[in-house]
Amino acid sequence: MLNKLIERENLSFEESYELFNMLLNESEMRIAAYLVALQTKGVTADEIAGFAKAMRDNAVKIDLGEVTDTCGTGGDGSKTINVSTAVSIILSCFTKVAKHGNVSITSKSGSANVYEALGCKIPETPEDAKKSMDKTNFAFLFAPKYHPALKKIMPVRNELKVKTIFNILGPLANPANPKYQILGVNSPDLLDNVAIALSKVGGIKKALVLYGDGLDELTPNGTSKITEYNGKFETYEVTPKDFGLDYAKIMPCESPDESAKRLIDVFSGKLNEDRNFILMNAAAALYTSENASDFLDGVEIAKEAIESGKVLKKLEEIRNV
């Protein structure tokens, strides 16, 4: 298959699935060759889907029932608060959330970093994650604990210091096999391919793949692009006005501790620039998980959860598991 990639020929879903499993037993030199050849050619939806399905199949198994995930590819280079973590906690007031996360890639506040800064403990085992889900409707799945098969590949990625298909795979490889997913990407070119790949991995009922003018979140100060999958695909653009919200500045964030403090400020009802950023993305997640009829409804539901104290109470429940 290496020659095929060098000749810039695309792989099928089946070939990509096979290649992932081959890489687990290859030398570091050949792993690097495959990853660079694939990246140079440009990855397709079938290749992303094949790798993601193989990554899930090689993951530590966990059954949490019908869950939603909110995460992004990262790698957008932004210094923002960790919106997806805020959204996942709000969403868990209404439905089961399995947050598949890791430490920071390029931001100042990766989801695992912020989760711990909020005073929450990352579950050590699938049994601990199930306990958290049963008690709180929320479980944090720390990616390295569920993908031990990647131990051989990760050093190669780090040594290469270039983007590879693995920069895309994290959100597609949640071992809990979410039925609903909101997934941010760091380039508009990835929208359709990632949405198609997500549909091919299997099990997804509804998903939003989104890009927010340089962010892997919906942006509160410009236009965002969304590819929605609900048995069929639809691509459209949105602004804060579609959510009934005013435009808001994106304020830089310098650390996980700062991100955690600012999330708690919003959860406490503070009216600031972060609030609309979080409300917009929470509304999209509520809509995706079928807990809101549309984006406007989602904003009102999220607002009520914050203003009634439900979200702060939920955070306290998660802390105390």
Curated annotation (Swiss-Prot):
Q: List residues binding Mg(2+) 1.
A: 84, 217
Q: Name one GO cellular component term.
A: cytosol
The name on file for this protein is Anthranilate phosphoribosyltransferase
Q: Which cofactor does it need?
A: Mg(2+)
* A GO molecular-function annotation: magnesium ion binding
Q: In which pathway does it act?
A: Amino-acid biosynthesis; L-tryptophan biosynthesis; L-tryptophan from chorismate: step 2/5
User: How is this protein organized at the quaternary level?
Assistant: Homodimer.
- Protein's organism: Methanococcus maripaludis (strain C7 / ATCC BAA-1331)
